[in-house]
């Protein structure tokens, strides 16, 4: 099948298939949201998410690394994020908190992923799960954080 036909077929379905990494991020976001709202251990949250229909389609290792990594480093990540905010961290919605923690973790701990890809993925999550203009806020905060955490990478792009 030609490329154009494949693209048309995808467009005809209405949605493109999500990558395994994107699904891993979405499930990690669900877990982080649950943690923000109700608490719980990483192991308990992971066990619940492993029982979902979407789980076998995800990058399971990456999901686990994200969920456990963010939860273990949440206080440090919050300190990194706070100077980039226009209000106290605890005044953000649980969705924004979860997305920003996830984005900050990827910026800090996964230098193999380009900073623009990390920000784009976070913005897409905010568009799908956040408030009306939440994606703009997430974009602005993570842009500021990327300048701090990925200065060499950003400098090389200029």
Swiss-Prot record:
GO biological process: DNA-templated transcription termination; transcription antitermination
Biased composition (Basic and acidic residues): 1-12
Keywords: RNA-binding, Transcription, Transcription antitermination, Transcription regulation
Record-level Gene Ontology MF annotations: RNA binding
InterPro entries registered for this protein in UniProt: NusB-like_sf, NusB_fam, NusB_RsmB_TIM44
Annotated TM spans: none
Region (Disordered): 1-20
Secretion signal span: none
Keyword Transcription included in the entry's annotation: yes
Domain of life: Bacteria
GO cellular component, one term: cytosol
Function (record text): Involved in transcription antitermination. Required for transcription of ribosomal RNA (rRNA) genes. Binds specifically to the boxA antiterminator sequence of the ribosomal RNA (rrn) operons.
Cited NCBIfam families: nusB (TIGR01951)
Annotated family: Belongs to the NusB family.
Annotated protein name in UniProt: Transcription antitermination protein NusB
Protein's organism: Nitrosospira multiformis (strain ATCC 25196 / NCIMB 11849 / C 71)
């Amino acid at each position: 099948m030609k490329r154009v036909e494949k693209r048309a077929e995808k467009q005809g379905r209405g949605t493109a298939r999500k990558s395994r990494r994107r699904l891993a991020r979405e499930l990690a976001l669900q877990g982080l949201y649950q943690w923000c709202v109700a608490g719980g251990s990483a192991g308990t949250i992971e066990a619940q998410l492993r029982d979902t229909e979407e789980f076998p389609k995800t990058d399971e290792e990456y999901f686990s690394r994200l969920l456990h990594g963010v939860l273990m480093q949440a206080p440090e990540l919050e300190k990194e994020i706070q100077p980039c905010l226009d209000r106290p961290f605890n005044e953000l919605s649980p969705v924004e908190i979860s997305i920003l923690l996830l984005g900050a973790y990827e910026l800090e701990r996964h230098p193999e992923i380009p900073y623009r890809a990390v920000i784009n993925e976070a913005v897409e999550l905010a568009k799908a799960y956040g408030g009306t203009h939440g994606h703009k806020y997430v974009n602005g905060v993570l842009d500021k954080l990327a300048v701090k955490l990925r200065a060499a990478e950003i400098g090389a792009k200029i």
